[in-house]
Amino acid sequence: METNDKKISVNKGNEAELNIIREIAESGDDCPVLMLNLNKYHDEAGFPNGSPYRDYINVLEDLLPRVGGRIVWRSASLGRAVGEQDIDEILAAWYPSHQAFLDLPGQPGAKENFRLRKICVKSAVIHRCNGVLP
């Protein structure tokens, strides 16, 4: 994820989905959203105990509350029963609204977060899910 004039763009991203997120944010019917991140890390990140990975998670944990968000949970992937996607970690980030997700790149600390993300994350798929938590 990279920032550009406080807009979110995703490498190899789904611009149609980002447009939906923007439409929801502007609709007056914005609602909480859970972003489920399926992450594959570079070997150099040292997942799960390496310094680059820990720095990335620490900065992310400091950044999300700036927009009212938080990491709900994260877990190492132990394997896959179905499919071919090779990932290291599943991370669930909750946002109070779609607008909060869009506001993240403009927050203090975002530039450092995206710098560390680029160092650590080899590939990611981020699914937008219902943000109503049990």
Question: For the regions a protein language model found, what residue spans apply to each?
Answer:
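Short S/T/G/P-rich N-terminal loop/turn motif that feeds into the first structured element of a domain
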Residues: 1-88, 96-103, 130-134
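Short, Lys/Arg-rich amphipathic alpha-helical interaction segments
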Residues: 92-95, 99-134
